[in-house]
């Protein structure tokens, strides 16, 4: 059983690279196809996977969110929902013994939390230890591969501007990413 997660900045080409990997390997690509569905369908699709969550998962999500400060409740709620969906999706496919590829997994959830927190701060190094301990439990008897998607940041900026994703453009400019 194999889980492949692609990690990188928004508009960096994660989905594109994931589709190339799917065509070469026998992987479940349902995670990649959800973005093509309408918002109503996506919501209920994600709820289906959340039912696979276990108590250990809820404890992990709670602990992670104690260390991350969000500017408002809506952003925090979206972050929690994202973690629930991703973990539920992984648990479901572990039960089915299906190898999967994800262009927005646990590390992307953490990265998103970082981007949405005031001053881009995650308050404690314990987050790394929490992730490490949790992944050992969640992914035992599995192969977990993380692929960092490298990209041309000029192209990413153009895509973000075209998509009117000003929050992430602001992050680029604030941190002088060139």
Predicted regions mapped to residue ranges:
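P-loop (Walker A) phosphate-binding loop of NTP-binding proteins
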Residues: 9
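Walker A/P-loop
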Residues: 15
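Short beta-strand-centered segment that lines the nucleotide-binding/catalytic pocket of NTP-utilizing
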Residues: 27-42
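ATP-dependent small-molecule kinase phosphotransfer cores
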Residues: 38-121
